[in-house]
Amino acid sequence: MTFITRWLFSTNHKDIGTLYLIFGAWAGMVGTALSLLIRAELGQPGTLLGDDQIYNVVVTAHAFVMIFFMVMPVMIGGFGNWLVPLMIGAPDMAFPRMNNMSFWLLPPSFLLLLASSTVETGVGTGWTVYPPLASNLAHAGASVDLAIFSLHLAGVSSILGAINFITTAINMKPPALTQYQTPLFVWSVLITAILLLLSLPVLAAGITMLLTDRNLNTTFFDPAGGGDPILYQHLFWFFGHPEVYILILPGFGIISHVVAYYAGKKEPFGYMGMVWAMLSIGFLGFIVWAHHMFTVGMDVDTRAYFTSATMIIAIPTGIKVFSWLATLHGGTIKWDP
């Protein structure tokens, strides 16, 4: 098997997982370099970069690189690809060729994001890309358009990956294995994939409307034509809040396995409680988004609802934390470095 055949045309979940891990490591170094620039600018009085726009571009790029090209490829693409088939005894992922495409959409997406920083004045909008700052008035030129296309590609990659993981986790188990016998990491990736499948299309819609506002004279987010910039915020945060749970849920799964192993236990405390806590967190994550928007002004009843719903998430999260503590309790703890 030639090098090209193995790495470019792979249909092997382990090879594709390795590609994801390597890509994530490289992107992580880019993201770290960007955060170093941020700290260098803020770590002393006066200016270092000397230009507010450049600083905002660095902050925006740092966020996108770390979220879409480091955490998600490593946690979902890397660990997910490597571990999910192994943990359920499947020969590979449900759709191995689509798995390959999910990975190879990421380098072009990364390239578009880097390009967005180098043309015109860059994307100095913050990772939220709110209009009217992201409009063709405040950000003329191709920068924001390139960033939008970058997000489109990363989004397609993640949606395809999500379909793959959902199908694999549900359908590729041996007949004797019920869903409630799969390891917690498999559950965490399954729930993460469901969140991706439900939230990313909304982001795609929002940024596509922003794209047409910028280039095709639509006014989805422009009051002059009957639009509303607040609509963009709702669309963005309906994705943006589940996204932060997408980033942390695979970590919850990993922590459960790590804690059980280092406590010398064969399983974590309260398996069913852990599963339902993750399911609850995933569900509740979709009905709290407007807490990111309190400063734009909201009805008192709306504020009360979003505040209460947000606080409810603390309950399943607490179940997870105390189950980890209960797993450690009474264990023969391995103090490996």
Swiss-Prot record:
Binding site for Na(+): 41, 46
Mitochondrial matrix topology ranges: 1-12, 88-95, 172-183, 263-270, 329-337
Cofactor(s) in the UniProt record: heme; Cu cation
Catalytic activity reported: 4 Fe(II)-[cytochrome c] + O2 + 8 H(+)(in) = 4 Fe(III)-[cytochrome c] + 2 H2O + 4 H(+)(out)
Main location: mitochondrion
Domain of life: Eukaryota
Subunit details: Component of the cytochrome c oxidase (complex IV, CIV), a multisubunit enzyme composed of 14 subunits. The complex is composed of a catalytic core of 3 subunits MT-CO1, MT-CO2 and MT-CO3, encoded in the mitochondrial DNA, and 11 supernumerary subunits COX4I, COX5A, COX5B, COX6A, COX6B, COX6C, COX7A, COX7B, COX7C, COX8 and NDUFA4, which are encoded in the nuclear genome.
Name by which UniProt lists this protein: Cytochrome c oxidase subunit 1
Organism for this UniProt entry: Tinamus major (Great tinamou)
Lineage, uppermost ranks: Eukaryota, Metazoa, Chordata, Craniata, Vertebrata
